[in-house]
Structure formats: structure tokens, C-alpha cells
Swiss-Prot record:
Entry's Gene Ontology molecular function annotations: structural constituent of ribosome
Predominant location: plastid
UniProt keyword annotations, A-Z: Chloroplast, Plastid, Ribonucleoprotein, Ribosomal protein
Taxonomy of the source species: Eukaryota, Viridiplantae, Streptophyta, Embryophyta, Tracheophyta
Descriptive protein name: Large ribosomal subunit protein bL33c
SUPFAM superfamilies tied to this protein: Zn-binding ribosomal proteins (SSF57829)
Similarity comment: Belongs to the bacterial ribosomal protein bL33 family.
Oxidoreductase among keywords: no
Organism in which the protein naturally occurs: Oryza sativa subsp. japonica (Rice)
Amino acid sequence: MAKGKDVRIRVILQCVSCVRKGANEESAGISRYSTQKNRHNTPGQLELRKFCRYCRKHTIHAEIKK
């Protein structure tokens, strides 16, 4: 039997620089990735360095609320 909530949850990561700029002028859009995180190991907000196809470079992607 499972106890309480699951340890692994699904999170969505969003590009921080695209959000600040309000999306690029040449291509409208915000880069998003979906992944999982372990609540016990990472209780805070998850931030990973991933490739943003709209900025065309590696940027920080932060966890957003659903």
C-alpha cells in the first residue's frame, strides 16, 4: 500500500530569459520541458540549464506552477 503522496512528481521547466523578454521578436514562443523530480531530494524549486530553441542557446529553465 502507498503511504501518502508519491515521492516523484511531474514538473514543467520554462526558460527564464524568454519570460523576461516577453518572447523573442523573430519567433514568438517560450521553451518548456517536462520532467520529474524527487520531492525528498529537491524540496525547493528546480532549475536546470537546458537548450532553448527560441533563444538558440543554453539558458536556465526554472520550475513553474501548474
